[in-house]
């Protein structure tokens, strides 16, 4: 199976089921080629208690993609909010573990589990 690592990144933003929750759902590879829209999204998002980054639709992430995820986490924390990643594939989890990002960013197995952290 050949994985497209330079395709477009789709970003969908919606309110979660739990009040005060924002869900950012990504679909496509998260790479240097397409991180800029996600960076802008993190900078412009509302101040809510919980931001959930749904990576279920992300087949591949490079170091630049990981960097923008960490920056999103830092941005949320700086405003007093929580940041949780869900749908982290084994491939992306391996990247997070290798760089110790898994010790910094909270992860949940499902969207419902992440919303319970609000």
Give short role names for the model-derived ranges.
Residues 106-110:
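Short acidic-hydrophobic, aromatic-tinged amphipathic segments that line or gate anion-handling sites
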Residues 3-40:
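STAS-typified acidic loop motif
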Residues 29-105:
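Amphipathic alpha-helical interaction surfaces in cytosolic regulatory modules
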């Amino acid at each position: 199976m050949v994985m497209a690592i330079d395709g477009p990144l789709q970003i969908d933003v919606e309110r979660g089921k739990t009040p005060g929750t924002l869900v950012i759902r990504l679909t496509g590879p998260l790479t240097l080629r397409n991180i800029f829209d996600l960076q802008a999204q993190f900078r412009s998002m509302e101040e809510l208690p919980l931001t959930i980054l749904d990576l279920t639709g992300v087949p591949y992430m490079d170091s630049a993609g990981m960097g923008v995820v960490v920056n999103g986490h830092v941005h949320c924390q700086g405003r007093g909010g929580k940041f949780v990643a869900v749908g982290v594939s084994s491939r992306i989890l391996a990247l997070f573990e290798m760089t110790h990002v898994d010790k910094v960013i909270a992860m949940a197995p499902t969207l419902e589990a992440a919303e319970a952290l609000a």
